[in-house]
Amino acid sequence: MLAYPRIDPVAVSIGPLQFRWYGLMYLFGFISGWWLGRRRAAQPGSGWHPQQVDDMVTWAIFGVVLGGRLGYILFYDLAYYASQPAAIFQIWHGGMSFHGGLLGVLFAVWLYARRAEREFLSVVDFVAPLIPPGLFFGRIGNFINGELWGAPTTLPWAMVFPDGGPFPRHPSQLYEAVLEGVVLFAAVWWFSGRKRPVGAVSGLFGVLYAIFRFAVEFVREPDPQLGYLAFGWLTMGQVLCLPLFGVGMWLLLRNRGAAEGPAAR
């Protein structure tokens, strides 16, 4: 068994101000996505300018924060937030949903594409490879917060989390950081480096994320207010991954054999 590091959730305190690791991880994710976007935009034939990346990332940030928070409230704990509306704004304590954040980003990208007169799916293809680093940092934030731990296990790398009871558990946050952050980034970044049919990069992102998240949910403790939804193992996270997988497969297969569009557009 490994010792849980017990990192103070507060990274820096300046008088009454507290800067928490969870919030800083989101900041690191936004910065990494912005930097990667500018790097991709600088490549010949990308069809993007750095200023356009700045504008698009700004729209996406609002989509992530608003969509992620609203998604968590609606999908995971509506009853609690209906009774404690002030808690809606306490984002630093956690409570963000990837699927809600994804919907928020898609809506923000749609608004940006409409304003910039760009094809929606082409913009999503450009954005998709920029997302996994943010997922990596977000899961590290979950780990530092000691939340979203895994199910009990006897594996040698199990950890006892501060609020997870006396049982050693899967560090499922780290599993997700590796799969959804590192592996997903490597696959989608490589795939998007060549010309692909419009929507194919977005499709690969959706399919791989759904597979990785669905798999990790088997060793992740479900949210206590929801538990398992069916069959003694099906979680809300897995349910939300099903349409993502379906849409991703459709995007991958719909233009199979079609002419490839501009890379990273």
From Swiss-Prot:
**Known Pfam families for this protein?**
LGT (PF01790)
Q: Which GO terms describe its biological process?
A: lipoprotein biosynthetic process
Q: How does it sit in the membrane?
A: Multi-pass membrane protein
Q: Which regions span the lipid bilayer? A: 11-31, 56-76, 91-111, 120-140, 173-193, 198-218, 233-253
Q: What is its EC number?
A: 2.5.1.145
Q: Which UniProt keywords apply?
A: Cell inner membrane, Cell membrane, Membrane, Transferase, Transmembrane, Transmembrane helix
Q: Could you tell me one molecular function GO term of this UniProt entry?
A: phosphatidylglycerol-prolipoprotein diacylglyceryl transferase activity
Source organism, top-level taxon:
Bacteria
Q: In which pathway does it act?
A: Protein modification; lipoprotein biosynthesis (diacylglyceryl transfer)
Name the GO cellular-component terms: plasma membrane
InterPro entries named in the record: Lgt (IPR001640)
> Could you tell me where this protein is found in the cell?
Cell inner membrane
- Annotated binding of a 1,2-diacyl-sn-glycero-3-phospho-(1'-sn-glycerol), by residue: R139
| Similarity comment text for this entry | Belongs to the Lgt family.
Q: What does this protein do?
A: Catalyzes the transfer of the diacylglyceryl group from phosphatidylglycerol to the sulfhydryl group of the N-terminal cysteine of a prolipoprotein, the first step in the formation of mature lipoproteins.
Family annotation (NCBIfam families): lgt
**Record protein name field:** Phosphatidylglycerol--prolipoprotein diacylglyceryl transferase
Whose protein is this, by species?
Nitratidesulfovibrio vulgaris (strain DSM 19637 / Miyazaki F) (Desulfovibrio vulgaris)
Gene name of the record: lgt
